[in-house]
A protein has these predicted regions:
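Short, solvent-exposed loop/turn segments at secondary-structure junctions
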Residues: 56-57, 125
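Short hydrophobic beta-strand that contains or immediately precedes a catalytic carboxylate
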Residues: 40, 48-55
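Rhodanese-like catalytic fold shared by cysteine-dependent sulfurtransferases
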Residues: 1-34, 43-46, 62-117, 122-176
Length: 176
């Protein structure tokens, strides 16, 4: 856990950031490699890395009946990215934990060595948490872009409107 942040900003048991997500970031992330815009531009042009946007949802979260995200604001991200809202929070419920696991398996084609780049916006801990979480799931080639869409757009790179991946709602079984 970074020593510069207050202990109360982190979950003592897991080490995930759980509050004040928009704050100064450390230089490194456990389980991942930090990249700068120049590095990300090269990976983007090569096209062999999965880009994962973990910007949190703004609005009422996902609808527990349909799994659709109820957003108050639209989101633009790096073209070709998969947007998985809220998976960078410090504590996830069972549904969001499964959502994260299932979507990583899907976008990596089940290959835990598939290169994936996680980002949000500048000074956002969501990608830091998501990298740690993906690493604990056994994913090995993880990149962290802490400047996120802010840094990307600042260098005149394209951003495009995005829609989040719908949450799969598992039916509940009632014993009769």
């Amino acid at each position: 856990m970074p020593t510069s942040a207050a202990d109360s900003d982190f979950d003592a048991a897991t080490g995930y950031r759980i509050s004040r997500y928009r704050a100064a970031l450390p230089e490194t992330v456990p389980g991942g490699t930090r990249l700068y815009t120049e590095d990300v531009e090269k990976l983007f042009k090569k096209g062999n890395v999965v880009f994962v946007d973990v910007m949190p949802s703004t609005g009422a979260g996902y609808d527990p009946e349909t799994g659709k995200w109820r957003l108050r604001k639209s989101r633009k991200n790096i073209p070709g990215s998969t947007w998985l809202p809220d998976v960078g929070r410090g504590k996830l419920n069972d549904t969001l934990t499964r959502y994260f696991q299932e979507n990583l398996a899907r976008i990596s084609d089940g290959d835990k060595s598939r290169a994936m780049l996680f980002y949000c916006q500048s000074d956002c801990w969501m990608a830091w948490n998501a990298i740690r979480r993906a690493s604990k799931l056994g994913y090995t080639q993880l990149y962290w872009y802490p400047e996120g869409t802010d840094g990307w757009a600042d260098w005149d790179n394209p951003i495009e409107p995005s829609q989040p991946v719908t949450v799969t709602i598992k039916p509940t079984h009632v014993d009769q």
